[in-house]
């Protein structure tokens, strides 16, 4: 049970710091709204027409695919650095990891997630 006290303390301190920062920000933020505060910031030009521009959801799909396959570098780099020490077992595990990633990429390609519509 004493092993979990550190984890619980870490979670509580994290929540307190997060909530404390949000509360402090709320309490000290400037509340006055005037003409200058509502204008376009710095060198921006005043907008003409509708300011809400809709982005295609295809951008979201590409961004999500990038994040998914970019995270693999976090695992590939340490493996490449310690490749000699890990031996054959490390090589097999990394090939399995890469196979799963390629399988996911193949599935996304098959479902049309990489096609621009």
Swiss-Prot record:
The chain crosses the membrane at residues 4-24, 64-84, 86-106. Keywords: Cell membrane, Membrane, NAD, Quinone, Translocase, Transmembrane, Transmembrane helix, Transport. Its EC number is 7.1.1.-. It is a multi-pass membrane protein. It comes from the Bacteria. It catalyses: a quinone + NADH + 5 H(+)(in) = a quinol + NAD(+) + 4 H(+)(out). GO terms for cellular component: NADH dehydrogenase complex; plasma membrane. GO terms for molecular function: NADH dehydrogenase (ubiquinone) activity; NADH:ubiquinone reductase (non-electrogenic) activity; quinone binding. It is found in: Cell membrane. It holds the Pfam family Oxidored_q4. Its main location: membrane. InterPro entries: NAD(P)H_OxRDtase_bac/plastid (IPR023043), NADH_UbQ/plastoQ_OxRdtase_su3 (IPR000440), NDAH_ubi_oxred_su3_sf (IPR038430). Belongs to the complex I subunit 3 family. NDH-1 is composed of 14 different subunits. Subunits NuoA, H, J, K, L, M, N constitute the membrane sector of the complex. NDH-1 shuttles electrons from NADH, via FMN and iron-sulfur (Fe-S) centers, to quinones in the respiratory chain. The immediate electron acceptor for the enzyme in this species is believed to be a menaquinone. Couples the redox reaction to proton translocation (for every two electrons transferred, four hydrogen ions are translocated across the cytoplasmic membrane), and thus conserves the redox energy in a proton gradient. This is NADH-quinone oxidoreductase subunit A. It comes from Desulforamulus reducens (strain ATCC BAA-1160 / DSM 100696 / MI-1).
């Amino acid at each position: 049970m004493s092993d979990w006290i550190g984890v619980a303390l870490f979670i509580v301190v994290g929540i307190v710091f997060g909530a404390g920062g949000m509360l402090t920000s709320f309490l000290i933020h400037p509340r006055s709204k005037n003409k200058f505060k509502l204008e376009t910031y710095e060198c921006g030009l005043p907008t003409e027409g509708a300011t809400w521009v809709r982005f295609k959801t295809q951008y979201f799909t590409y961004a999500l695919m990038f994040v998914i396959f970019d995270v693999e570098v976090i695992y590939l780099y340490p493996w490449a650095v310690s490749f000699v020490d890990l031996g054959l077992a490390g090589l097999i595990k990394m090939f399995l990891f890469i196979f799963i990633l390629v399988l996911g990429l193949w599935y996304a390609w098959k479902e049309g997630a990489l096609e621009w519509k």
